[in-house]
């Protein structure tokens, strides 16, 4: 079934070294791959992402709906709507995630 951002993201946002996450779909409608984009908290080095990703997978495995999220990508800083700084630019993030996956990131 479908995954909803408001059900998925809070599960991962509790991680102390994560600033925020954004669930995006990559691929053709109906056959989309769930990708969780992860923005690390201030001061957290990108080199720590492999460990953080493992911990996020463990968090996700505790819930049936988040266990299905298999792809995690570190993003340096989410694009946001200029008018509403907190509103994440999900379309841009989805395009970025698709490009990362094409490059075999």
What are the residue ranges of the model-derived segments?
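Conserved C-terminal "lid"/linker of ANL adenylate-forming enzymes
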Residues: 20-26, 36, 57-105
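AMP-binding/adenylate-forming catalytic core of the ANL superfamily
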Residues: 1-65
């Amino acid at each position: 079934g479908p995954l909803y951002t408001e059900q998925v993201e809070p599960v991962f946002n509790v991680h102390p070294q994560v600033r925020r996450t954004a669930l995006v779909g990559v691929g053709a409608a109906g056959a989309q791959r769930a990708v969780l984009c992860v923005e690390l908290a201030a001061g957290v080095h990108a080199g720590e992402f492999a460990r953080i990703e493992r911990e996020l997978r463990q968090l996700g495995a505790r819930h049936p709906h988040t266990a299905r999220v298999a792809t995690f990508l570190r993003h340096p800083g989410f694009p946001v709507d200029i008018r509403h700084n907190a509103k994440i630019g999900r379309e841009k993030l989805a395009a970025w995630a698709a490009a990362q996956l094409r490059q075999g990131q």
